[in-house]
Amino acid sequence: MHALAALLRRLPPSCGPVRLVGVDGHAGSGKSTFAGRLAAELGGAPVLRLDDIASHDELFDWTGRLLSQVIEPLERGATAHYAPYDWRARRFGAPRPLPPAPVVLVEGVGAGREALRPHLARLVWMELPREEAWARGRARDGAGQRTFWDGWIPAERRHFADDPSRPFAHLLVRQGEKGYEMLPGPAGTALEALFFTQGDGPSAMC
């Protein structure tokens, strides 16, 4: 994780003064946990969770809201204010600030969608097969969320069929018993190859 944090810090800004980093993957693939650990390694970098931007009525049709509430202010170097969605109350809450920190993480399914990629400094993909990820997510959320998952899975299938993220990922992350394994992704550059190569052994784990 230290190597990834070092790589991100040295990147040029991508969204105003911010290095915006997307963490994408199938639901249940471990995005939130990974983003939280990466944020800590970055000294407390802000994390925008797309669960706060999406809603029951707009599982994936939230691009306009994200652009207006978050991306456009950050591009101006201003603090963004977004209204997080309350999934229990089924309504948006009071605005929450998101400062233009040197690195800001955007975590959630669809973080690497086409409309957002021009604003990203890097895109990370959690490398876990979708069926395995969905099984993990169902187990995590329990029987009470069965109906939600029954609707979510076909919606996620449609989203990635129309707007795939993985082919544009700079880095692939696999969670193992000893930590995270990191490999250059399909869109990886020489910088990823320098920091993360399959032959690096322990240096590719964190």
What are these regions (language model features)?
Residues F34:
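Hydrophobic positions on the alpha1 helix immediately C-terminal to the Walker A/P-loop
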Residues M1-C15, P118, A139, A161-C206:
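NTP-dependent small-molecule kinase module
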Residues R37:
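Active-site signature of alpha/beta-hydrolase-fold catalytic machinery across serine-
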Residues K31:
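Conserved lysine of the Walker
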Residues P46-V106:
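Conserved nucleotide-sensing/catalytic segment adjacent to the nucleotide-binding pocket
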Residues G93-R140:
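ATP-dependent NMP and nucleoside kinases share a basic, alpha-helical "lid"
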Residues H26:
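P-loop (Walker A) phosphate-binding loop of NTP-binding proteins
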